């Protein structure tokens, strides 16, 4: 990727990652771009621990509509969330589990507030299987152990960023789309970030940062 396009968000990987971590600490979303030879998409990501209905509404409005909760394998086991399919043959091995809904405190489960309730229920320290109904309108994703050093996906990036910011290892993500329904690529993501004041980084930035700091 042409790094000059990212210069407004930091001149180095270190700067961009630190800006993103600070944004997370302040409860603000960040935009993460993956490799051009992978999905070549940008996801808007919020810490699951602090996401608000207003932020969820922005994900729904400007994203693909598939709002995902990225969590660790340990959390999936705690909630007894099996894979969505027995044999995952998707190109990037995206690890969807069965979809979920909070068992209490929601109506249809579709609204921004209901989806936030479902997320907060799922990441609660003492959350158990019976706190959730299946299927639902939130799509959990199981992050690979080792984060972006193991798999260079938005799922792992969101969990890594949450951990680096001092939050529970859980992030909420959605792919950003253009007005015509096509997927937003780097130039559109940069313009979107400037319009709404988001930080931007790449998964490669995060890999470089983790390797440099051995974290």
From Swiss-Prot:
Binding positions (Mg(2+) 1): 39
Pfam family, one: DHBP_synthase
Cofactor remark: Binds 2 divalent metal cations per subunit. Magnesium or manganese.
Residues noted as binding D-ribulose 5-phosphate in the record, renumbered to the chain: 38-39, 43, 151-155, 175
GO function terms (MF aspect): 3,4-dihydroxy-2-butanone-4-phosphate synthase activity; magnesium ion binding; manganese ion binding
Alphabetical list of Gene3D superfamilies matching this protein: DHBP synthase
Name the record gives this protein: 3,4-dihydroxy-2-butanone 4-phosphate synthase
